[in-house]
């Protein structure tokens, strides 16, 4: 018997042996859609959330941390009644490594179909979801769970107006031209008590921007700022757009949000709510995302606003994009010492999660398994700061799996590096920004945002003419550092401007 024949007999024997390895068990979710919910065959992202206990697991979509309910994601193209969307063991998953690692037990399962192209939110109008379903799952035994999308997020409806809060939604011509479809700006407006009692009086305008993804409905809460004897109109911008928070500036991917806000929204609000319409009577403020936006609006539109109060701003110098130096680092996930790069810390320095952990979640949420289409933080930054790819989508700064940084996109990012913008244009900007910039950050910021502010502050020491502004650090203070009453300071600056 020759060796080749012996080998064949041995292989056949192993294949038929009772001790041969069993094929891996299949873990699979099959999702159908009820008739009448989609306008036609529709592309989107199908998400499966595996919760514990009662309630709706979909409410947990977007949470980070190792204890968050697992969520899986897969694309479904041309989804329609009669088409089965499949999410299985090969799909992207968070926070565990794979579906085979899921602990056996009872789960409350819910499916979501995210397809709204204008608002990258799981609960955006038109998105579909299933009713929760309790199922026993054991990955070692395998399973197939069938779900049906029967529920739909209702059409957008503005909250009810009140005596001191009004809400707006109107079509932006600039954004509609860019996107080739109707695009809308939404805003909340908090009015001072004097608006009703002094009908001939005009007011300064404060543009308020909240933390990441804060919606315009925050106007119901910011009205409390007006109780301190600072009569002004507060305009609350909306932190939702095609790639998450649009950051209210012009970008290659989101379109001309900055121009839409300054040339369409603000003039409309000033006419409607008796504002002065004078640059000396316009101000910006916000924290975190709002900290960056308030500063960016002041820098990119230096003659349009009379001051910004920026708290814990998102990275203002891309040498410290949190802990990533986009100009010299090779990898977003691993630092130059070979260790995983933290993405959030406690005040004592302990790591809460890493950049890789955050991006794993965004790869689940993003179409084509891509963090740069997730609608979350890294996605939004990439869309605002980076270039548009040949496919019409944002070009990613780094590879979704390896974290390797693509140096070819960095040139576009420089245009939104606020330290570089100020440095490169300081001769022109200095007189137009005199006394207008106020930045505050804790030097133990949860997201390492103090590092970029420190680099900016160091750069301003070399400015000629000298920098006329405030950059203040709070010792051992985290992301909530807020040492001044900005409304009082804004009121004081407005009074000194002598606007009549």
Sequence positions of predicted segments:
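N-terminal secretory signal peptides that target proteins for export/translocation
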Residues: 1-3
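Selective for proline/serine-rich intrinsically disordered segments
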Residues: 16, 21-22, 190, 202
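Beta-rich accessory regions
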Residues: 22-23, 461
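Non-catalytic cap/lid and distal C-terminal segments of serine-dependent acyl enzymes
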Residues: 51-500
